[in-house]
A protein has these predicted regions:
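Conserved ABC ATPase signature
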Residues: 129-137
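Catalytic Walker B motif of ABC-type/P-loop ATPase nucleotide-binding domains
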Residues: 154-158
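Conserved ABC ATPase "signature" region
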Residues: 111-126
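Conserved ABC transporter NBD signature motif
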Residues: 62-78
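Q-loop/switch helix immediately C-terminal to the Walker
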Residues: 86, 91-107
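Hydrophobic anchor residue at the start of the ABC signature
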Residues: 143, 182
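Helix-to-loop junction immediately C-terminal to a conserved catalytic motif
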Residues: 58
């Protein structure tokens, strides 16, 4: 592990993975692997199962067949963050209180909430009720949750949704920094994501109709 690396070596493997919801098979027999420092983008039209695949990898939806499993001998750190397309913000709590809540829930093992807000450009809004945030600002707050608790795997559903060009750049920087620490990321996205120091891999999903 280098001085920059935070996470122990990790490999993710999907073997014969099939997923779907409500009896509908959306993708089947997926095989791929991902190792520390890699980013995988899930691409495909609406309805091809990108979100369902993320939920399956997060353990929220059971696979229909096959398996998705981490290989990380001896590492007891919680595995993943799942950041869905909904921001899950409490509108009557302040921006800082929202982030403090998530830090306590997931374990305050990363940045202090104030520092995380600065990283995503929300420091001046820390005392504002979160219900007053714009859509882009709310997305930045959701992304700040990734920074307050350490998890090697980030599962992101449309991370750039509602973000302007500066916000797209923020997502790229956050991802690049996470990968440089030995983390992994899998993101479902319609938007191109260009990382400063590495090229993401792409898994094109076609769905089953």
């Amino acid at each position: 592990m280098t001085d920059q690396q935070v996470y122990s070596p990790l490999t993710l493997r999907a073997s014969g993975l099939s997923c779907g919801r409500s009896g509908l098979v959306l993708n089947e027999n997926l095989d791929f692997s991902l190792t520390s420092g890699e980013c995988l983008l899930l691409r495909g039209p609406n309805g091809t199962g990108k979100t369902t695949l993320l939920l399956t990898m997060a353990g929220i939806v059971a696979p229909l067949a096959g398996r998705f499993a981490p290989e990380r001998p001896g590492d007891e750190m919680p595995l993943l963050h799942y950041c869905g397309h909904r921001n899950a913000i409490k509108p009557r709590l302040s921006v800082l209180e929202n982030l403090g809540f998530w830090a306590e829930l997931n374990g305050p093992t990363g940045l202090e909430p104030e520092a995380a807000l600065a990283e995503v450009g929300l420091a001046r809004l820390a005392g504002l009720d979160a219900g007053y945030l714009s859509a882009g600002q709310a997305r930045r707050l959701a992304l700040a949750r990734l920074l307050v608790s350490l998890r090697p795997l980030w599962l992101l559903d449309e991370p750039t949704a509602a973000l302007d060009a500066a916000g797209h750049g923020l997502v790229a920087r956050l991802l690049d920094a996470h990968l440089a620490k030995g983390g992994l990321a899998i993101a479902a996205t319609h938007d191109p994501i260009s990382l400063p120091d590495r090229a993401p891999r792409v898994l094109q999903l076609e769905g089953i109709w």
